Amino acid sequence: MDYLILMICIVVSGLLLYSSRTSKMKLPPGPPGLPIVGNLFDLGSLPHRSLAKLAKLHGPVMCLRMGRLRVVVISSDSAAKEVLQTSDTLFCNRFVYDSLTASQHHTFSMALLPPTALWKSLRKISASQLFTNARMNASQHLRRKQLEDLLSYVESCSRSGTAINIAQAAFNTSVNLLSKTFFSVDLIDPSSSNSVEFKEMVWQIMLESGTPNLADYFPVLRRIDPQGNRRRMKIQFEKILDLFNTMIRQRLDEKGGCFDEINDTLDALLKINQDNSEELDLSVIPHLLLDLFVGGSESTSSTVEWAMALLFSNPEKMKKAKEELETVVGKGIAVKEEDTGRLPYLQAAIKETFRMHPPTPFLIPRKTDSDVDLCGFTVQKGSQVIVNAWAIGRDPSLWENADTFEPERFLGMEIDVKGRNFELIPFGAGRRICPGLPIAMRMLTLMVANLINCFEWRLEGGAAPETLDMSDKIGFTLQRAHPFRVIPTSIIQGCDVSTALNN
């Protein structure tokens, strides 16, 4: 009995001390929650929109309770700057969803690792081997070849009157660009059903990453994985990792361990491993490639689809983009990489697409390992911190007519997407900014420019552009709720696509 009384006293004392400590903190405001589940039912099926509405009531730094998890939601450019830049070192750790622990991916992933020696090594390799300006310029011929394949495919659909799924076509191009750069081979044949299967694998990974999971909100449930998110994620991870491991083994056999001649990214990575396995262990390489393929292909293809849909559903904006292309490049002539810097209206349309439909509306969540002061509030240790880039892009205090597609707003405005302007952060900012930004911007700009300069488009059934459904859905990336399917009519000048591109 005395022991029981002692234990009760200890527990009560602990609760009183915790209550006293938290009462002295100024915690971020937020909506009241239900017992046990907290604010879980406030998210709905479109959490980026639900949280933006709640932020209008409770402020740009808002705290919700999702089961046992505290979630701090950032919905203003100034607060985002504090998290991503000013106090970056205090918010640099990642909150790892339970599904992403499948196949131990979180222990190798550049996107998910805390800022450890391995993370620093992977960032260094990305900066020096994958996405330097010199490497980007050296691989222009690869992008030209993939663009030629895309335009040839669209041209063939034009001749047959076949509707094109823009996201699927852009996805195929993105994957093959990355696979050419990394492995010197194409992973996808646009006319093959394998392309649909590969995209489905990537989408399932994005979907499982973004689906609310009880195991994230009630850690005691992680052991049993009640919704099966981690089990389903492991299936998709293993398929892609097995593919990459097979390609690595084949390359090692081909090279016989000699990597004096570097032909592609895989050669470069294997040489780093050969020279210093402590800098890059062989087991890390498939996970690095998984991050780059999944993040790069899906975000690029979804942005191309949104940009095309926005221009198509706003005929006056499409007309301006086409007139600029006709003036700078020539109507029906394939756009080259060096042309894109002379297309300010098209660049503005891409930025406006990012503003309205950022590919990852919550970026990648952060986690605090200690109590942190933020904008006059205390963010408690162990909190998940998410930046609602979608809400910032729709903030009427930052953007006039925030829900209207107006590329003109960016003309003459010194705002870019490189993490320096926190009104527009589709790739994040600070030291954890997306490393694939350079190649993503080059490729998606080229795809959009050529699709609108070399083809006219119409909806199936002859529906008017203004009737296009612009609703969205969310996995980890922001997708169109309904695929953008349109029928092309070629206006390519010259005898064929290859000639047009190489003139």
Curated annotation (Swiss-Prot):
Primary location group: membrane
EC identifiers of the protein: 1.14.14.72
Cofactor section: heme
Membrane spanning residue stretches: 7-23
Cross-referenced Gene3D superfamilies: Cytochrome P450
One Pfam short name: p450
GO molecular function term, any single one: monooxygenase activity
Annotated catalysed reactions: (5S,9S,10S)-drim-7-en-11-ol + reduced [NADPH--hemoprotein reductase] + O2 = (5S,10S)-(9R)-7-drimene-11,12-diol + oxidized [NADPH--hemoprotein reductase] + H2O + H(+)
Membrane topology: Single-pass membrane protein
Subcellular location: Membrane
UniProt entry tagged with the keyword DNA repair: no
Stated role: Catalyzes the conversion of drimenol to drimendiol, a precursor of the sesquiterpenoid polygodial. Polygodial has been shown to be an antifeedant for a number of herbivorous insects.
Family per similarity comment: Belongs to the cytochrome P450 family.
Name the record gives this protein: Drimenol monooxygenase
Species whose genome carries this gene: Persicaria hydropiper
Gene responsible for this protein: CYP76AJ1
